[in-house]
C-alpha cells in the first residue's frame, strides 16, 4: 500500500504553529467557519506535505481546495474546530488562553473513515 511505502521513505517532521486562521463559510455551511492553527512554512515540512498530498490526491479526489496541492494553493493548516460565526470571539479567546503556539512533531500518518474511526496508523521513524 502506498501509505506504508511513503512512511518508509520519510521521517518524523518537526513543526511550529505560528498563527491562527479561519477557512470561510461555503456552500451549505454558511453559518460556520473552520478555525485552524497554521504551521510555520519551513521547507522540510512543506516538502513533506506536498509529497504526501501529491500521492494522496492521485487516489482520493474531492478533498477540497484548502488541502489540495493539485490546485497549487493549499492552506496548510491543522483544524481545531468548526465554529458558528456568532461564536468566533469566544473560540478565539479560548485559543489565546491556551499554549497553542508551540512546537510539535508529526510522528505518524493515520487513515480514518468518516465519522472519525481509525482504520490504520503508520508510524514515522526518527530522523
Question: Which stretches of residues belong to each language-model region?
Answer:
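Histidine-dependent nucleotide/RNA phosphoesterase domain, centered on the 2H-phosphoesterase fold
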Residues: 1-127
Amino acid at each position: 500500500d502506498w501509505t506504508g511505502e511513503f512512511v518508509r521513505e520519510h521521517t518524523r517532521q518537526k513543526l511550529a504553529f505560528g498563527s491562527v486562521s479561519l477557512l470561510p463559510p461555503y456552500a451549505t455551511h454558511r453559518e460556520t467557519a473552520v478555525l485552524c492553527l497554521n504551521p510555520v512554512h519551513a521547507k522540510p515540512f512543506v516538502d513533506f506535505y506536498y509529497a504526501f498530498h501529491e500521492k494522496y490526491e492521485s487516489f482520493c479526489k474531492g478533498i477540497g481546495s484548502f488541502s489540495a496541492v493539485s490546485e497549487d494553493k493549499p492552506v496548510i493548516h491543522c483544524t481545531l474546530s468548526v465554529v458558528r460565526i456568532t461564536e468566533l470571539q469566544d473560540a478565539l479567546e479560548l485559543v489565546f488562553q491556551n499554549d497553542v503556539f508551540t512546537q510539535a512533531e508529526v510522528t505518524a500518518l493515520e487513515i480514518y473513515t468518516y465519522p472519525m474511526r481509525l482504520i490504520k496508523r503508520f508510524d514515522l521513524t526518527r530522523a
